[in-house]
Amino acid sequence: MYREKRRRQCCRAFAALALSTALFMPLPAHAMSLTLTEAIDMALASNTGLRITAEGERSADAALKQARGKNSISAEAGDTLRTSKSKDEDAQASNTLSLSARLPLYSGGANEANIESGEIGAQSARLTTERAREDLKYEVIAAYWDAVEASKKIEVQRDTVNKYDAHLKNVTVLYDAGAQAKIDVLRSSVELSNARQELVRAENTYAVSLATLRNLLNIDRTEELTLTTEVAYQPFDTSVDNCISYAYRNRLDLAVARAKLRRCELAVERARAGKRPSVNLTLGTGVTSQFQPRHDTSTDVSASVGVSWNIFDSGVTRGAIEEAEAERDIALLNVKKEEESIDLNLRKAYLNMREAEQRFTSTGDAVRQAREDYHIANERYRAGEGILLDIIDAQTALATAQTNAISARYDYARYRAQVENLMGTELTESEHAAAERLPAVTAEERAAAQAAYIEGGTDAAAKKVK
């Protein structure tokens, strides 16, 4: 019953603040309108950091190809031109063409471990990319709400400046009429100056937030943006324990950590293979043509099965095994640490979300009451019944109440997004579609990078000469 009542209070409060603050959103001319959904899709389709992570898939796939190739047939061709002269013999000259093929029959389990490790690595690379997409989504959400929150706080500070400016004019008129002391004029001027400084800080915070958002979206860093999505209160009914259980099942970075543990176990198997023999099948053929002292041609075909066994290496193999076992145990502990971090971070974000929810509920009537208090204090002062301190206190209380309401509202939105991210909530279908548009490195980009490197090197050399 209490939670349902609080939910209704939050919904009404969110709606009221959204309506009151939407009227004050800055709307620069010729700015690009951007919803939160559009911002997320743009980032998933163009973020440079995400492109870097995605390239790791190519690297992992290439490593898997190498591992499979080492367990398959390899062939070599050679051509040798030879000349020799021995004492009391005629000079000899010949040319030999050779072709050989080699197939590993048994590697002690090393090749098989390498292949399985490569397969796990390729899958882990894809999981890492997907987790990077989820993290990027959260970063965009947080940056978007940071910018919207900053824009609303600008209006609070601008309203404060306007009120202090109007009050200063009123006090000046009263002072000129002999109804107020000069100290009231001076104090009002100081408060106006302080309010203007707070406005400058708020405007800078907004500019920094937009710069962060543009960087995530990888758009023109001077692009004017109009953020059009209004945050709406969405109840979150999942318990913290259920959130943690969900995260243990769905966090992709935890899956990557577990996969790394398996790869370390395979590395132990690979190191132990050094104690076992290796068996290889080799087939070869060759043609030798002799030019001096006479012309002659001969061919040969060979087949062999070779066994190699490292019976003593002064402890090198034993050391490799111990190193691999240590790395395996480190990976095991890293999985445990990752699980503990998930638990802690989720609990912190969850508690912060609930705290922001309660703060917003408690600020529901504070803004209305602060406005009424300011109006009363201002009218009492104009009538000569109040003192300047009453107006200053009332204005400070009003600005604080407005700022607290805005902060609580956007803190809740950010912490909710963080909780969902820490749970490992997957992307939507439309977000996956946007992520599929992420481009690989193009030939034009490589050429431009090479040109920039050459130009930069030339400039550096020229400066060194000077």
Q: PLM features: residue spans?
A:
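Acidic, low-complexity, intrinsically disordered peripheral segments
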Residues: 3-6, 30, 404-466
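Bacterial N-terminal signal peptides
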Residues: 15-26
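Sec/SRP-type N-terminal targeting helices
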Residues: 51-55, 68-69, 105-133, 158, ...
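Metallo-beta-lactamase
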Residues: 202, 252, 408
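Cleaved targeting-peptide boundary
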Residues: 31-37
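Periplasmic alpha-helical coiled-coil/stalk elements that build and connect Gram-negative outer-membrane
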Residues: 2-6, 129-246, 349-352, 356-359, ...
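A small-residue-enriched
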Residues: 38-106, 128, 138, 219, ...
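A short glycine-centered flexible hinge/capping loop motif at secondary-structure junctions
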Residues: 175-179, 381-385, 422, 426
